[in-house]
């Protein structure tokens, strides 16, 4: 199976072999004849998201590391940067530029051979899922949405902390204690563990050789790379362990059997797996441990394994996979060492997700439980929006309150507010502003979740430092919210950057459902009876010409929203009247690409602006395309 995530940018290339070793790459080049310029691409076993280029020349194989830069480009050390591994290979087919020769002929994977996955790729999906479950106590759709929207960040988080789940990692123990642990039980050559030496990211590899325990210091350099003295550098400990399980490469011997951590009773919890025969050197032959990564089960969220008691460590005779995580829960990791994720906020899940917070049967709230601040957050034809606090059963919830003008006494305005409340009470998604309820008191009030940073367009106008990948992250979240609306048979009808509110710089929610309509199961569009005060510059041609609204017309609006986001909150069709915009669209013309906007994102905008509604993509397709591009640029 092809690996996802880190190798996604190369999986489509027929000459990409995935997580193979240098020796395996050389064997393939020999199969291909070793002609000068014959080459293949493989996944780096040292650097997260990196690759290695193996090239034949002079009957020898030459290997070049391709690192992924912080801005998402790829480069061979000291060479030019390229948008993708494919672009890099194409460039070096025309310019040697530091390579031993030009790349002349790719060696493609034999028929039926898929890119090989590494140990982390095999474990990653389950590790991420369990990490999200246990860290934020999420289930169902909230869990799925968290994984989809934050997968690149979660992958990096898991990749750099995965060693904590591995049986060979013993945390911060002393040199003397590590020797005692290694010498307990079998004396298999290559038996090993890794311990933390200090709080600065320094570790030690403890390795058994001919009855003696050897200690190799593992240092972290200024860029965060890990290595033994004079050894290869790695992004993670598990990559280092994987490498030295294949070849000694400076060690006295390869790593074979990990010293696993034992519970207080001296038993290893295998989560129901059958026990395997006792450890034997042949079982742990070089490279063999990688090929035996198996599925595993985690404890239920909240289950905590008792910590090992000092002096009560003994070695089980059960064979243990060094790449299989320990059956212990993830430690909560919400400290200052990482940026807050949407799941860290109080508005990711519904306020009624807590079973003790009983959702009222009626949407009406008790005014006595609502406190309002004097300062206005915004205003419009309907009235004002203020910040407030609503006393729920267990917590006080910070809320935004839309207050109808007191003097209006316009039944139409009240009907609009109630219609909006009716739509909102049916929606529950992390990327949509949820309604808490409505209040009938000195004025009619709609009580909603709070998004502190306000409208997306205004935020971007005032924060030009926000990077492309951050904008891609936000518009992807909007597409997830709109995909949910599409699946729920709702048409928004007022999708624009002004109606996307930011909870944090990395968390967006769709708001303002005043024009929204619920479609019946047998309907795929809503037909307005009359032309109202419509945001024409965001509307698809069929809305303007035929008053027909559907999820596909929301897709058109989403394209305009994307243009607003990548132009940092500029107004679309600036200086043009609605009739001029309509005429422009009828001629097949569209807005130009915002300065600095990635070409792929402008291409997606134009796809959203497909004139014929039947040929325009739905949000399922738009979200998937955005997701793939987002994963590619953020990884």
UniProtKB/Swiss-Prot annotation:
PTM annotation (Phosphothreonine): residues: 256, 317, 345, 384, 530, 582
Mod. after translation: Ubiquitinated by CBLB after BCR activation; which promotes proteasomal degradation. Autophosphorylated. Phosphorylated on tyrosine residues by LYN following receptors engagement. Phosphorylation on Tyr-323 creates a binding site for CBL, an adapter protein that serves as a negative regulator of BCR-stimulated calcium ion signaling. Phosphorylation at Tyr-348 creates a binding site for VAV1. Phosphorylation on Tyr-348 and Tyr-352 enhances the phosphorylation and activation of phospholipase C-gamma and the early phase of calcium ion mobilization via a phosphoinositide 3-kinase-independent pathway. Phosphorylated on tyrosine residues in response to IL15.
Family stated for the protein in its record: Belongs to the protein kinase superfamily. Tyr protein kinase family. SYK/ZAP-70 subfamily.
EC number of this enzyme: 2.7.10.2
Expression by tissue: Widely expressed in hematopoietic cells (at protein level). Expressed in neutrophils (at protein level). Within the B-cell compartment, expressed from pro- and pre-B cells to plasma cells.
Record text on subunit structure and interactions: Interacts with LYN; phosphorylates SYK. Interacts with RHOH (phosphorylated); regulates mast cells activation. Interacts with NFAM1 (phosphorylated); probably involved in BCR signaling. Interacts with VAV1 (via SH2 domain); phosphorylates VAV1 upon BCR activation. Interacts with GAB2 (phosphorylated); probably involved in IgE Fc receptor signaling. Interacts (via its SH2 domains) with CD79A (via its phosphorylated ITAM domain); the interaction stimulates SYK autophosphorylation and activation. Interacts with FCRL3.
Residues reported in the UniProt entry to bind ATP: 377-385, 402
Annotated SUPFAM superfamilies: Protein kinase-like (PK-like) (SSF56112), SH2 domain (SSF55550)
Positions of the UniProt region annotated as Interdomain A: 108-167
Region (Interdomain B): 260-370
Catalysed reaction equations from the record: L-tyrosyl-[protein] + ATP = O-phospho-L-tyrosyl-[protein] + ADP + H(+)
Effect on the protein upon substituting residue 342 to T: In IMD82; constitutively active protein tyrosine kinase activity
Annotated source species: Homo sapiens (Human)
Name assigned to this protein: Tyrosine-protein kinase SYK
Keywords from the named record: Adaptive immunity, Angiogenesis, ATP-binding, Cell membrane, Cytoplasm, Disease variant, Host-virus interaction, Immunity, Innate immunity, Kinase, Membrane, Nucleotide-binding, Phosphoprotein, Repeat, SH2 domain, Transferase, Tyrosine-protein kinase, Ubl conjugation
GO cellular component labels: B cell receptor complex; cytoplasm; cytosol; early phagosome; nucleus; plasma membrane; protein-containing complex; T cell receptor complex
Phosphoserine PTM positions: 44, 202, 295, 297, 316, 319, 350, 379, 579
Disease named in the record: Immunodeficiency 82 with systemic inflammation: An autosomal dominant immunologic disorder with onset in early childhood. It is characterized by recurrent infections with various organisms, and multi-organ inflammation that manifests as colitis, hepatitis, arthritis and dermatitis. Patients have a propensity for the development of lymphoma, usually in adulthood. Disease severity is variable.
């Amino acid at each position: 199976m092809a690996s996802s995530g880190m190798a996604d940018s190369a999986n489509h290339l027929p000459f990409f072999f995935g997580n193979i070793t240098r020796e395996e790459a050389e064997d393939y080049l020999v199969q291909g004849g070793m002609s000068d310029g014959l080459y293949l691409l493989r996944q780096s076993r040292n650097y997260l998201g990196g690759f290695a280029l193996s090239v034949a020349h002079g009957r020898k194989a030459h290997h070049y590391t391709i690192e992924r830069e912080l801005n998402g480009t790829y480069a061979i050390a000291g060479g030019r940067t390229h948008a993708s591994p494919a672009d890099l290979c194409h460039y070096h087919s025309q310019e040697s530029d530091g390579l031993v020769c030009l790349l002349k002929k790719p060696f493609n994977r034999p028929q039926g051979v898929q890119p090989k996955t590494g140990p982390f790729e095999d474990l990653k999906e389950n590790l991420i899922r369990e990490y999200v479950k246990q860290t934020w106590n999420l289930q169902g759709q909230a869990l799925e949405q968290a994984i989809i929207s934050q997968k690149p960040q979660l992958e990096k988080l898991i990749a750099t902390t995965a060693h904590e789940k591995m049986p060979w990692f013993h945390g911060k123990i002393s040199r003397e204690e590590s020797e005692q642990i290694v010498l307990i039980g079998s004396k298999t050559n290559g038996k090993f563990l890794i311990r933390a030496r200090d709080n600065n990211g320094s570790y030690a590899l403890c390795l058994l050789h001919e009855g003696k325990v050897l200690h190799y210091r593992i240092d972290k350099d200024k860029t965060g790379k890990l290595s033994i003295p004079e050894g290869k550098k790695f992004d993670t400990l598990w990559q280092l362990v994987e490498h030295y399980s294949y070849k000694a490469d400076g060690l006295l011997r390869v790593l074979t059997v990990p010293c696993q951590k034992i519970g207080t009773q001296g038993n290893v919890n295998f989560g129901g797996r059958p026990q395997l025969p006792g450890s034997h050197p042949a079982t742990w032959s070089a490279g063999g441990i990688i090929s035996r990564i198996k599925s595993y089960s985690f404890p239920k969220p909240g289950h905590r394994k008792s910590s090992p008691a000092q002096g009560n460590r003994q070695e089980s005779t059960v064979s243990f996979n060094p790449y299989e995580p320990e059956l212990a829960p993830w430690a909560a990791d919400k400290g200052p060492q990482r940026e807050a994720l949407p799941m860290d906020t109080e508005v990711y899940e519904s306020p009624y997700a807590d079973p003790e917070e009983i959702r009222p049967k009626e949407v009406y709230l008790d005014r006595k439980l609502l406190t309002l601040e004097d300062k206005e957050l915004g205003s419009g034809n309907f009235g004002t929006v203020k910040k407030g606090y609503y006393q729920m059963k267990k917590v006080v919830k910070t809320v935004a309150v839309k207050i109808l003008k007191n003097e209006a006494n316009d039944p139409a305005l009240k009907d609009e507010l109630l219609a909006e409340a009716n739509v909102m009470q049916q929606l529950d998604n992390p990327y949509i502003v949820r309604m808490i309820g409505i209040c009938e008191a000195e004025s009619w009030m709609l009580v909603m979740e709070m998004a502190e940073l306000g409208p997306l367009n205004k935020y971007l106008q005032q924060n030009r430092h926000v990077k492309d990948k951050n904008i891609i992250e936000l518009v992807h979240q909007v597409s997830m919210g709109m995909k949910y609306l599409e699946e729920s048979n709702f048409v928004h009808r007022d999708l624009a950057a002004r109606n996307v509110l930011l909870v944090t710089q990395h968390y967006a929610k769709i708001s303002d459902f005043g024009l929204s309509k619920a479609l019946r199961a047998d309907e795929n569009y809503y037909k307005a009876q009359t032309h109202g005060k419509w945001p024409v510059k965001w509307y698809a041609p069929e809305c303007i010409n035929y008053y027909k609204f559907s999820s596909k017309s929301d897709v058109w609006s989403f394209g305009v929203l994307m243009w607003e986001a990548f132009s940092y909150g500029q107004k679309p069709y600036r200086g043009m009247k609605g009739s001029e915009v309509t005429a422009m669209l009828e001629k097949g013309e569209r807005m130009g690409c915002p300065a600095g906007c990635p070409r792929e994102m402008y291409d997606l905008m134009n796809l959203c602006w497909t004139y014929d509604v039947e040929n325009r993509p739905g949000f399922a397709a738009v979200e998937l395309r955005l997701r793939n591009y987002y994963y590619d640029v953020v990884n």
